[in-house]
From Swiss-Prot:
It is an enzyme of class 4 (lyase). Keywords: Decarboxylase, Lyase, Pyrimidine biosynthesis. Homodimer. This is Orotidine 5'-phosphate decarboxylase. Belongs to the OMP decarboxylase family. Type 1 subfamily. One of its GO terms (biological process) is 'de novo' pyrimidine nucleobase biosynthetic process. Catalyzes the decarboxylation of orotidine 5'-monophosphate (OMP) to uridine 5'-monophosphate (UMP).
Amino acid sequence: MSIIVALDAKSQYDALSIADQLDPSLCRVKVGKELFTHDGPQTVRILQDRGFELFLDLKFHDIPNTTAQAVCAAADLGVWMVNVHASGGRKMMETCVERLKAGNYRTQLIAVTVLTSMGREDLRDIGLDVEPFEQVKRLAQLTQESGLDGVVCSAQEAKMLRDLLGTEFALVTPGIRPEGANADDQKRIVTPKQAMLDGSTHLVIGRPITKSERPNEMLKQILSSLA
């Protein structure tokens, strides 16, 4: 079990201001689209120099060759983990896995199933008349069959996926909120302890830590709750 702190900051300065209050031996960090688009690979390198393993959360989704090139570019940065959209399909995901193996990269590759902000009506709007957990199940199985290391999923689906996919498949879970925290824009949320019990291997936690007056103390409290 590990905690990934989401550095959902607008600038490198803001991200580093948070990271400098965290102990890299206690967590990994996640860099997403806004921060990476604003400041690029430099922010990744600085965080790595500070001792953090990094999850580059860019959710690549394109034709197979283009997606694989982007994944390998992320691996060239030395990131610990990168992700793609499982809805890009089997060929796209398999091509990414093949390229990473050919390059002897150690970067873990996972796939996004259904965004945690999406409910049944949101899926219906894009032509998928299914419950979110059914689509998660379908895409998670496809991801495993394609050779990836794991999926991003809601903790509410984690137990079902753990039973379905076995013990070696990573389940990376956003929408984690400690007891009493605001749900913000996440529709499918759960506490850290419950997520761990349900089979999640990595917990993505943002605002409850990054907006805390003492981020590292909040991180320690969450880790203690998992003991």
